[in-house]
A protein has these predicted regions:
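Short, exposed beta-strand/loop patches in secreted or surface proteins that constitute
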Residues: 65-73, 145, 152-154, 232-239
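Acidic (Asp/Glu-rich), glycine- and aromatic
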Residues: 269, 273-275, 280-297
Length: 297
């Protein structure tokens, strides 16, 4: 897993924007001597108003796939993203039109995400049908066994992950033998027929380890789990078609070691996982509501 604080950091790429009445020209330069593939280009929409309902992105006059995302759930789109493949030492200009009417355009999905409550009336492990987008639980409530595949799962054609909905919040791995989206069909638990057909499977035993990586506390000698929180929320912010965004919020987190020098008061931590199409790495952003200079993680 890869932890980043910046929304996007593309080494060797630079962008400039010219705007006229919500018509944008986005120029992207690859200054490196190697090609760059599946590079996410993310545009902050705050300067362009709160009435954006649709976006059209074109390269050389041809429309390409793009995605609008409402990150904070206020009904306004915060970011526009699209994916760029760039030859070495090249410059490409993308034309973006922002519209205040209509609906977001639809494109072939290159990513997938789901959260599913366990339906005990459905016996099959990959035919569960109680889909949700968000769940918040109180202190002391552990929904791990009530969640099918134990929390939100998300994938692109190369990789697939899930996040445990409990005090570990570990990122677990689903291995693939071939490129393609599989979780909608396997729901993380491949049956015999699917295995014979070449589908992937849950390949990592996590336990109390860090799995592929997770954010935890540190008491000076060892990591601490996120056991004492006022509320824990896991939600899917975006389902695609170009990126999935999954968020974990630990509201009022109190370390089990009590009021020591590292954790003198409760804090709220938000961990956001963004997976783009065509990439094996997952962008992880961690935000804190309070100052945490005296905390260790």
């Amino acid at each position: 897993m890869k932890r980043k604080i910046a929304t996007i950091a593309l080494c060797g790429l630079s962008c400039c924007v010219l705007m006229a009445q919500k018509q944008l020209d986005i120029t992207v330069k690859n200054t490196m001597k190697t090609e760059r593939t599946a590079q996410p280009i993310v545009i902050n929409l705050a300067p362009y108003g709160t009435d954006i309902r649709q976006a059209i992105v074109k390269m050389n006059g041809q429309e390409i796939a793009s995605q609008l995302d409402d990150l904070n759930g206020d009904g306004c789109y915060d970011e526009l993203c699209f994916i760029a493949d760039m030859a070495k030492k090249s410059t490409t200009t993308y034309n973006v039109e922002l519209l205040n009417s209509g609906k977001p355009r639809t494109y072939k999905p290159l990513v997938y995400a789901d959260m599913i409550l366990l339906n005990k009336k459905v016996k099959s492990n990959n035919e569960q049908n109680l889909f949700i987008s968000s769940l918040t639980v109180e202190n002391g409530t552990n929904p791990y066994w009530q969640m099918h595949h134990h929390g939100p799962a998300f994938e692109n054609e190369l990789v697939a992950y899930r996040i445990y909905f409990d005090h570990r919040q570990t990122v677990d791995l689903y291995g693939k033998y071939r490129k393609g989206l599989e979780l909608k069909e396997t729901q993380f638990y491949t049956n015999k027929q699917q295995k014979e057909a070449g589908y992937g499977d849950d390949v990592l035993w996590v336990g109390n380890t860090f799995g592929l990586g997770t954010m935890r506390g540190w008491d000076g000698q060892q990591p601490t789990l996120l056991e004492d929180v006022d509320h824990r929320t896991e939600r899917i912010i975006s389902y695609g078609p170009l990126r999935t965004i999954v968020e974990v919020v630990d509201d009022g987190w109190k370390d089990k070691t009590g009021n020591n020098a590292f954790h003198p008061y409760p804090i709220t931590m938000t961990t956001r996982y963004t997976l783009y199409a065509g990439r094996r790495d997952c962008q992880v952003d961690v935000f804190f509501r309070q100052a945490v200079a005296n905390h260790q993680f």
